[in-house]
């Protein structure tokens, strides 16, 4: 009975961690005027002190690409800071998720003007502004900003996140099928690493790892 209970708890925990599965048809690609759709960093990559919370989309090594609303919703937050995401826009969508666009060059004109006014009134270089549904509603495809290289960024790109609005749980845009990377090249094995394993305990034993090059004939 105890073993069954443990198995049940583990199973329900795993199922709960999966959460809602998003519908890729609810979203469009967040960038326009690209020569090709490529991304440079994946979800969950190890970063200093944290895991990467989204995907980084290439912008042809250029700034100023139009960033558009992935779905209907409204601009709920605008951030301007020296580090982190730099200039960032948060869109709360009607489908229950929030998308984040980071490292922007500039916001669209009306938002840019509002941010400038707030900076002068607050006498601050950075701002963190929140808005309700009636301030800046957006339709799918509306331009909200332009891509850039602001904040803690190593080159022009768009940082793209999807979160559950209520819980702030992160979704992997690639696993959810919202960002579809091109994968035209089969994997190629170039080396094999050999480590002896205890056949009873299933753990590596104290042996010197061996490495072998794979040669195609």
Segment roles from a protein language model:
Residues 93, 162-164:
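Residue-level signal for short segments within beta-strands and strand-turn junctions
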Residues 39, 101, 144, 159:
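Short alpha-helical segments in extracytoplasmic peptidoglycan/chitin-binding modules
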Residues 102-140:
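Aromatic/His-enriched, Gly/Pro-containing loop or helix-boundary segments
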Residues 17-88, 92-95, 125-127, 131-134, ...:
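Surface-exposed, glycine-biased beta-strand/turn segments
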Residues 155-162:
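Histidine-centered catalytic micro-motifs
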Residues 4-13:
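Sec-dependent N-terminal signal peptides
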